[in-house]
Amino acid sequence: MRDKIKMVSSAGTGHFYTTDKNKRNTPDKLEMKKFDPVVRKHVMYKEAKIK
């Protein structure tokens, strides 16, 4: 089953992306570099739960 997750910027800007992932195939927390438009740079985004 694919669960919805939130990818939060590690730059501390509060910007986030929403996506989904298959928890059976990727049980670990996701980390990926994505563009943060607030600081206009590519920064690490980490997985967080959607409340």
UniProtKB/Swiss-Prot annotation:
Gene3D superfamilies the record matches: Ribosomal protein L33
Key words, A-Z: Ribonucleoprotein, Ribosomal protein
Coiled-coil regions, chain positions: none
GO BP terms, alphabetized: translation
A molecular-function term among this protein's GO annotations: structural constituent of ribosome
Pfam families: Ribosomal_L33
CC per GO annotation: cytosolic large ribosomal subunit
PROSITE patterns membership: RIBOSOMAL_L33
Regions of compositional bias (Basic and acidic residues) in chain numbering: 18-28
UniProt region (Disordered), positions on chain: 1-28
InterPro entries xref list: Ribosomal_bL33, Ribosomal_bL33_CS, Ribosomal_bL33_sf, Ribosomal_zn-bd
Family to which the UniProt record says this protein belongs: Belongs to the bacterial ribosomal protein bL33 family.
PANTHER family: 54S RIBOSOMAL PROTEIN L39, MITOCHONDRIAL, LARGE RIBOSOMAL SUBUNIT PROTEIN BL33M
Name of the molecule in the record: Large ribosomal subunit protein bL33
Species per Swiss-Prot/TrEMBL record: Chromohalobacter salexigens (strain ATCC BAA-138 / DSM 3043 / CIP 106854 / NCIMB 13768 / 1H11)
Gene: rpmG
